[in-house]
Swiss-Prot record:
Record-stated family: Belongs to the UvrC family.
SUPFAM superfamilies according to UniProt: C-terminal UvrC-binding domain of UvrB, GIY-YIG endonuclease, RuvA domain 2-like
Assembly and binders: Interacts with UvrB in an incision complex.
Name the UniProt record assigns to this protein: UvrABC system protein C
CDD domains, A to Z: GIY-YIG_UvrC_Cho
Source species: Streptomyces griseus subsp. griseus (strain JCM 4626 / CBS 651.72 / NBRC 13350 / KCC S-0626 / ISP 5235)
Principal localisation: cytoplasm
PROSITE patterns per record: GIY_YIG (PS50164), UVR (PS50151), UVRC (PS50165)
GO function term, MF aspect, one: excinuclease ABC activity
Role noted for this protein: The UvrABC repair system catalyzes the recognition and processing of DNA lesions. UvrC both incises the 5' and 3' sides of the lesion. The N-terminal half is responsible for the 3' incision and the C-terminal half is responsible for the 5' incision.
Cell compartments where the protein resides: Cytoplasm
Length: 717
């Protein structure tokens, strides 16, 4: 009996998307298949206390040895894939799955004089149009109920139909407008068949025509002031849109295709293949490979095709192969595939429709597989230790860098320049010690100068904290620094400390900080902005909490090449810190730059050390660009009312709504502002004072005519 905790996925590995999951035993046989609207929540239920599980579920999870999952776009897709896998694998723990019947289809009996829409199971009949399969019969009934508003096709049995024809009275659906009542002659057989064919066309995917027609009729009815009819047409269009979601199918019934997707970074690539037969996903394959050579997506696709079909013949090679990028010589590859199949094979990139949507699902699975692989690789203790040792050896460090800090600069064409600092301890991200910086020492775009400023500010604070905690017996008084924010982190795994002496501290506290060769004078260190948006008061000397920058790294990594590395090293030298190593990662990840070296250090692509440096660099880039975008968005949405103390978002919106714009609010008197509900006189005076100190925006001018365009100066806040 296996222990479920031995194969339980780690927190965060399972996505919260719809999907299908499989439990396998120790012999890799599938023993259970299930579907979920939220994979993370559903799969987690299997790994609770065994005593709380149903006896059959308890037996299943103790028999299993692994669990796998596949992400899909919608719950309908999950139902279809679940059905395919249950039929394919016949899992032993699915014997009581639903009612053990074949899955239901939505059928239209076009072989009858008055076609009927109904739920059908079992063998297909000639002259009947089928749509599905569906997971439940009620799902079909919900779809049909929505569509009968627009396509009132017959749904009754033959007995009910004949009885209504004999009595001359239709059934209830005929009275409420969900059946055209051909039984009593309200429509002719030809008109009813046309309704049935329109119903089939919509279910087959030709949806846009009908929705556009309804919306056009709705607008026309509204113009003619027939509002009740317009409202019904609006509801009909909404019903069709909801039906589209409920009746989604993977692909057309006759489709045989393989869909291949690739997710990649500079070092690795994940491939996912969905095998579609008869319009349904019959199987899935995937693997992750190291990019041992410089290869693009086209090359990865070509390698995948060779491995997939190199030993296949006949129908094992499908009629259609859909890929994210064509090989370098698509004609030759297509001919190679055709030779193996014995007939023509279409190799192409899907551009629209259901195939493009399904390709997006395959792509999501590839991304998920790559992310899961990276998570497993990063969390392995042996792998992390080897990565740190490889970095130490490549950079000539005495010990493994147990604490690594990485810095990245982000801006948009020189505006909103920010920087990020991320921390990795023992090869794992320590997010509680991430920090963000605003570059305020100069204007414009200069990544090298920005890097120098950030490194100088960070380690100046480190020296100040070191003096404040009394680690030096003798040190000059530190100059007032920027406000400090309490950090919730504990001490680092690293044990080494910088050994800069009092002289260095004096330079850091009082002396000028150079910003590069072009600097002509002292540049005051601007305030530091931490991950928290607001600075907090200085902590007490004896509060026992770790300070924000109290722990030095053994290695500083900067995003960039030789210029950025030189700037970081110069900033450390100016502070008298000489025992912290510095390196930089150029855009080509195999190049690691060191200070004063003319040539980069080249690590093998398969190196765990290079892999760790890449993760550190990517995390710093992500953190920086997220902050930069948030800062830019805040600036764009800013309003003069933001500076009014005590004026919250609700009352700001009330002011704008009352006056229409900031421009009109600026022209209002205090008494007029007090008329707004919730605004007192003191607040009104603060609003007037704030707007008086803020100059109105310059008018917009049409550059072609010189005309001034009247615009309100900011309706948002």
């Amino acid at each position: 009996m296996a222990d479920p905790s031995s194969y339980r996925p780690k927190p965060g590995q399972i996505p919260d998307s719809p999907g299908v999951y499989k439990f396998r035993d120790e012999h890799r046989r599938v023993i259970y298949v299930g579907k979920a609207k939220n994979l993370r929540q559903r799969v987690a239920n299997y790994f609770q206390d065994l005593a709380n599980l149903h006896p059959r579920t308890r037996t299943m999870v103790t028999t299993a040895a692994s669990v796998e999952w596949t992400v899909v776009s919608t719950e309908v897709e999950a139902l279809q894939l679940e059905y395919s896998w249950i039929k394919e694998f016949d899992p032993r723990f699915n014997v009581k799955y639903r009612d053990d019947k074949s899955y239901p289809y939505l059928a239209v009996t076009l072989n009858e004089e008055f076609p009927r829409v109904q739920v059908m199971r079992g063998a297909k009949k000639k002259g009947v149009r089928y749509f599905g399969p569906y997971g439940h019969a009620w799902a079909i009934r919900e779809t049909v109920d929505l569509m009968l508003r627009v396509f009132p096709v017959r749904t009754c049995s033959a007995g009910v139909f004949k009885n209504a024809a004999r009595t001359g009275r239709p059934c209830l659906l005929g009275y409420i407008g969900k059946c055209s009542a051909p039984c009593v002659g309200r429509v002719t057989p030809e008109e009813h068949r046309e309704l049935a064919e329109d119903f089939c066309d919509f279910m087959a995917g030709r949806t846009g025509t009908y929705i556009r027609r309804l919306e056009k009729d709705m607008m026309q009815a509204a113009e003619e002031m027939e509002y009740e009819r317009a409202a019904r047409l609006r509801d009909d269009a909404e019903a069709l849109k909801r039906a589209m979601e409920k009746s989604a199918v993977v692909l057309a019934d006759a489709t045989d295709a393989d869909l291949i997707a690739v997710a990649e970074d500079e070092l690795e690539a994940a491939l996912q293949i969905f095998h579609v037969r008869g319009g349904r996903v019959r199987g899935q394959r995937g693997w992750v490979t190291d990019k041992v050579e410089a290869v693009d997506t086209s090359g990865l696709v070509e390698h995948a095709l060779q491995q997939l079909y190199g030993e296949e013949r006949g129908d094992a090679v499908p009629k259609e192969v859909l890929v994210p990028a064509l090989p370098e010589d698509p004609e030759a590859v297509s001919q190679w595939l055709a030779d193996r199949r014995g007939s023509q094979v279409s190799l192409r990139i899907p551009q629209r429709g259901d195939k493009k949507d399904l390709m997006a699902t395959v792509q999501r699975n590839a991304q998920q597989a790559l992310g899961l692989h990276k998570t497993k690789r990063a969390s392995d203790l042996t792998t992390r230790s080897r990565a740190l040792e490889e970095i130490a050896e490549a950079l000539g460090l005495d010990t493994a860098p147990l604490r690594i800090e990485c810095y990245d600069i982000s801006h948009l064409q020189g505006d909103d320049v920010v920087a990020s600092m991320v921390v990795f301890e023992d090869g794992l991200a320590r997010k509680s010690e991430y920090r963000r910086f605003q570059i305020k020492g100069f204007e414009g775009q200069d990544d090298v100068r920005s890097m120098h400023e950030v490194i100088g500010r960070r380690f100046k604070r480190y020296l100040q904290d070191k003096e404040r905690t009394g680690e030096w017996e003798e040190a000059p008084e530190a100059a007032p620094g920027s406000a400090s924010v309490h950090a919730s982190a504990t001490g680092p795994a690293a044990t080494g400390q910088a050994t800069a002496g009092p002289a260095a501290m004096g330079q850091a506290a009082a002396g000028p900080v150079s910003t590069g060769p072009a600097a002509t004078g002292p540049v005051p260190a601007p305030e530091l902005t931490a991950a928290s948006p607001d600075d907090e008061p200085e902590p007490r000397e004896d509060d026992g909490r770790p300070k924000r920058f109290a722990y030095p790294p053994q290695l500083v990594v900067v995003d960039g090449g030789q210029p950025q590395v030189a700037a970081a090293r110069r900033a450390l030298d100016e502070l008298g810190i000489d025992d912290i190593a510095v390196c930089g990662l150029a855009k080509r990840l195999e190049e690691v730059w060191l200070p004063d070296d003319d040539d980069p250090v080249v690590l093998p692509r398969s190196s765990e050390g290079l892999y760790l440096l890449q993760r550190v660099r990517d995390e710093a880039h992500r953190f920086a660009i997220t902050y930069q975008r948030a800062k830019r968005a805040k600036r764009i949405r800013s309003s003069p009312l933001d500076d009014v103390t005590g004026l919250g978002e609700t009352r700001k919106q009330a002011l704008i709504k009352h006056f229409g714009s900031v421009k009109k609010l600026r022209q209002a008197t205090i008494d007029e502002i007090c008329e707004v509900p919730g605004i007192g006189r003191r607040t009104a005076e603060s609003v007037v004072a704030a707007l008086a100190t803020t100059a109105p925006a310059a008018p917009a001018v049409n550059t072609a005519t010189g005309e001034i365009i009247e615009e309100d100066d900011g309706g948002s806040s």
